């Protein structure tokens, strides 16, 4: 039997504290540095490819951390190997600021998954040690930008499902020493992953 600690969701959030040094970027400068990103993520950060993430409107601090993690290899994305090697930290901060300043477009939702997805997102499944997603990502999926917790609302369901699966099998491991996302995702079955990803895609920031 899984024993649940008090304030479990709050503790999970605290474990996700962002470690990267971040001083903020300049969106105007960032716009001049994203040309090589446009093919996969769109000129305004709204990728039309469901397997590639939308970056528009994402929290600046979170974006910087992900860019830095990709650059150092802490987050492994085969298609991005070497693409960020010539950028310094200020360049990455500027790119993050540019995408954060853009407006996200709406995503496609598979209605058949919405009810289960809503239940998992809002309430989790405490019998299996799955907390709700709202503690860190908010009731409407807007995240917590100052703390570095990502906005999920409106993201492509396909991309979200792949990331949850990657966390569950350990292919993605840049969630900090607390292993919060890995611990949660490995408790979810494939239907729950697909459902919560579809529900999140339909949320509006």
PLM feature spans:
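Electrostatic cytochrome c docking/interface patches
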Residues: 17-34, 48-51, 101-127
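Short, solvent-exposed interaction modules
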Residues: 108-149, 157
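Axial heme c-ligation environment in periplasmic c-type cytochrome domains
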Residues: 48-54, 69-112, 146-151, 169-203
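The canonical Cys-X-X-Cys-His
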Residues: 37-44, 95, 130-139, 196
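Bacterial N-terminal signal peptides that target proteins for export
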Residues: 1-10
């Amino acid at each position: 039997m899984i024993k649940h600690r008090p304030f479990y969701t709050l503790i999970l959030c605290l474990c996700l504290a962002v470690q990267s040094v971040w001083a903020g970027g300049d969106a105007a400068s960032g716009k001049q540095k994203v040309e090589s990103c446009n093919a996969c993520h769109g000129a305004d950060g709204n990728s039309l490819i469901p397997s590639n993430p939308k970056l528009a409107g994402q929290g600046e601090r979170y974006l910087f951390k992900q860019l830095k993690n990709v650059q150092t290899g802490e987050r492994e994305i085969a298609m991005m190997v070497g693409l960020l090697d010539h950028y310094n930290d200020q360049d990455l901060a500027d790119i993050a600021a540019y995408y954060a300043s853009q407006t996200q477009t709406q995503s496609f939702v598979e209605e058949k998954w919405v009810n289960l997805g809503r239940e998992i997102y809002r309430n989790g499944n405490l019998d299996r040690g799955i907390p709700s997603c709202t503690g860190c990502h908010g009731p409407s999926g807007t995240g917590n930008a100052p703390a570095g917790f990502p906005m999920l609302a409106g993201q492509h369901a396909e991309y979200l499902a792949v990331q949850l699966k990657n966390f569950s099998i350990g292919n993605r491991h840049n969630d900090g020493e607390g292993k919060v996302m890995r611990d949660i995702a490995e408790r979810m079955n494939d239907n729950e992953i697909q459902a919560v990803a579809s529900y999140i895609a339909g949320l509006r920031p």
